[in-house]
Design a protein with these regions (language model features):
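Left-handed beta-helix
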Residues: 87, 95-261
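Unchanged
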Residues: 1-141, 255
Length: 261
């Protein structure tokens, strides 16, 4: 960092599912002559997450940064994304290390709100943190909403998410297959009934099998007459004929890689 020529540094949480244009946040940062800009979102009424919240002035200045036991409807939830001037970040890290501090948010930023010009930039799109099996399951289920899917996987080249390409034949639906509200990847063969589920490539669903509210990863085979509901199957799993597996929204049943059940 000392040898770099960049004026600004972007720190972003690795467990946040979000598609954000940081150019707009950078414009906000410059417009307010900020030392630090924290990106936040208004908490929706059904948000089960925990984390830091921001108390803001009417001019978007951060007055307080704290971590309540639970988040409430309308709280300003910090998304773990920070724009900061490089020199200020470097000075803050060196100072906190010398004083024995280890947490940049709680130990450094939260105690520097009067010394630094810290502002909050509101993000109004989809943003969810994956911190548990439950939240992983819920974020995947959110993709079944076309509005969420289009926002996260935006076809606009400036916002597009690039992934590894793996060409396969199109999914094949047999005569008795029934599919509703699913994301089904190439290479899948569907002979049974699938609802509200996500299927990775080359999944096979047998005759009269029923899969609901589940995440089925690649190369999984689901036998004839099997029943799955609220299940997460890792790749290369084999679910035998007439097997019945189920979980709940809060506790989806997880099947390990290469398991045979």
């Amino acid at each position: 960092m000392k040898r770099g020529k960049s004026k600004y540094l972007l720190l972003s949480s690795g467990n946040m599912v979000i598609n954000i244009d940081y150019e707009e946040a950078l414009h906000f940062h410059r417009k307010h002559n900020a030392d630090v800009t924290l990106i936040y979102q208004k908490v929706p009424a059904d948000c089960p997450e925990k984390g830091y919240t921001l108390t803001l002035s009417d001019k978007d200045r951060v007055l307080e940064l704290h971590k309540p036991a639970t988040l409430s409807d309308g709280d300003n939830k910090f998304l773990g994304c920070i724009l900061i001037d490089c020199e200020i970040f470097q000075d803050s890290i060196e100072k906190s290390y010398a004083e024995g501090y280890h947490h940049f948010i709680g130990d450094v930023l939260a105690t520097s709100l009067k010394r630094l010009r810290v502002f909050g930039y509101q993000f109004k799109g989809y943003a969810r943190r994956v911190t548990s099996v439950e939240s992983y399951f819920q974020v995947n289920m959110d993709l079944l909403d076309p509005r969420t899917w289009r926002e996260l996987l935006n076809p606009n080249p400036q916002h597009r998410i690039y992934t590894k390409i793996n060409d396969e034949a199109p999914a094949k639906y047999m005569e008795e297959a029934k599919a509703s509200n699913c994301l089904i990847a190439n290479g899948c063969i569907i002979e049974g009934t699938v609802e509200n589920s996500i299927f990775f490539r080359r999944v096979k669903v047998g005759r009269n099998a029923v899969v609901k509210n589940s995440i089925i990863m690649q190369y999984t085979e689901i036998g004839d007459d099997a029943r799955l509901d609220h299940v997460i199957c890792d790749k290369n799993t084999v679910i035998q004929q007439e097997a019945a597996l189920s979980g709940t929204d809060e506790q989806p049943l997880c099947i390990g890689k290469k398991a045979v059940l």
